[in-house]
Amino acid sequence: MTLSIRALDAALGAEVNGVDLSQPLARSDIEVIENTWRERLVVVFHDQQLSDPQLISFSKNFGELDPPGPNPYGQPFLKEHPELNVISNVVQDGQPIGNLGDGEAVWHADMTYVDVPPKAAMLHALEVPPPEAGGNTYFANMFAAYESLPADLKTAAEGKTAVHDASTNSAGMLRKG
C-alpha cells in the first residue's frame, strides 16, 4: 500500500491512508506522518486494529511517552501497560475498566496542568457512540485562534502564562496523592 494524505479542513486535520499501524513502519513513512501532524495538527487513521503493545510501539516512533495520570483510585489503568489511559463507561464485575466515559470530561486540553505538557496525544477509539449521542471528539487550532486575535489582545497576552490546577481531573474528581 502507498501512504496518502488528505486534508480534512482548512484549519486543521489530515487523514492518512495506506498504512497499517499494527506493523513496523519505514522511517520514511514515520517522517511523512510526523510532518503531516506538525503541519495539520491532527492526524486521523481509520480502521486500525491495534493491540495495546502495538499502539505503544507506534506511539514511541514520535518520542518518549508521558505517563497518563492515575485512575481515580491512584493506580494505572492497565498495570501491564502504564503508558495507556483507558476512557470507558464499561463496567466489568462491578468495577469500571476506565474513567471519563460517561460524559464527565467536558471541553479540555490534555495534560495542560503539567509544567511541560506532552507534544501530542494519541486516541485509539475502539467503540464510540454516534454523534447524536455525544460521541464527537473536537479539536481546535489554537495557533489560528491566536493569529485571529486583534492586535491589542495579542499585546495584552504577550508574556503571560496560565496556571492550570492539577488537583482535580477532567471530571472534577480530586486526584489521589
Regions found by a protein language model. Name each.
Residues 2-177:
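Non-heme Fe(II) oxygenase catalytic core, chiefly the N-lobe of the double-stranded beta-helix
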